[in-house]
Amino acid sequence: MTAALFVVSEEGYWAEECIKPLTTLESAGVDVTIATPSGSPPVVDERSLDPEAAGGEAAAAEFREIDAEHPKLNDPEPIATVEATAYDAVVFPGGHGTVWDVNQDRHARQLLLETVAGDDGVALVVCHAVGILAFTREADGTPLVADRAVTGFPNAWEEGIVDEHDRMDDGRKLPYWVEDEVVLAGADWDAELDADTSVTVDGDLITARGPESSTAAAATLLDAL
């Protein structure tokens, strides 16, 4: 059976970016495992459950129900205990929370590196989780993302979320902006700001811009599998 690992934030994952790929893969018969940095259940960003952000009342209710009741989401594995070679795909959903935990986690970075470096695996990285690409390096120190085509959460959108001191509404200071770090690491960045969705495929690395691209990203991943 085809197997996929989801690496989800405990600091605030974006519901659509996790749940759309999760339900799409499960509906296609893919065996899904959930992992978080510590092994505690992931924490959804409440902003992503607002009907306006979720795409309507029905979608918001569905996301809230799945977050609360999905057995695997509520009983994850610690990242340090899973092996990339056990999975055909590794998925990194976004959400601002990833900038504080998943993107900075050495075991998460190793999972990504091993997935993309191998011959069989494929990685899907969404929205703010794309920041992990800036901090994942090959054995010789070369950034994994160097010269790769990617999309992700753009500065143009971040400007509308943080204040002049990079603080979010909840008071947390954003430690870095995804686009800045990924470009600095040598990526060929294009968030396709004029397009309704943005999904970029570069070999065994799939990246998606944000929530509105989650469905297309899931379909692209299924095609790759």
Where is each model-derived feature located?
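Short, thiol/selenol-centered motifs that function as redox-active sites or metal-ligating centers
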Residues: V125-V130
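Extended, subdomain-level signal for the structured scaffold at the beginning of enzyme domains
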Residues: M1-D120, I132-L225
